[in-house]
Amino acid sequence: MQQGDGTEAQVTWEDQQNINRFGRLNNRFHELTDEIRLAKEANENLEDAGNELILCDEDVVRFQIGEVFAHMPMDDVEARLEQMKEDAAKKLERLEEEKESILAQMAELKKILYGKFKDAINLEED
């Protein structure tokens, strides 16, 4: 590889490991972005279901369990829905924390790799 001053930068085994690690982190970052989007949609759907349940005036409502709808008392459905909302919020929070951790690791690797290779390496997305 050519650096800006005309000398070749030697890529060591450690450098290659850092480049590979950055690539894996970048892939996981994109996976997390998709997972976060889906988790937010699930949270919105649960919130909408809760709002619809408030408007419902029946004692027994249909509740989806897997592929099937079951008739359940309104109180049980409300309790299950609240638990599902809590679980979804915790999952979203965990995904956001993992995303922040990955961004920090990627920033550290960028600093190391750009410090050695300068303009000879591109770690930015277009």
Curated annotation (Swiss-Prot):
Record keywords, A-Z: Chaperone
Its job: Binds specifically to cytosolic chaperonin (c-CPN) and transfers target proteins to it. Binds to nascent polypeptide chain and promotes folding in an environment in which there are many competing pathways for nonnative proteins.
Subunit structure: Heterohexamer of two PFD-alpha type and four PFD-beta type subunits.
GO biological process: protein folding; response to cold
GO MF term set: unfolded protein binding
Gene Ontology CC: one annotated term: prefoldin complex
Keyword Chaperone: yes
Lineage top rank: taxon: Eukaryota
Protein's recorded name: Probable prefoldin subunit 4
Membership in a protein family: Belongs to the prefoldin subunit beta family.
Name of encoding gene: VIP3
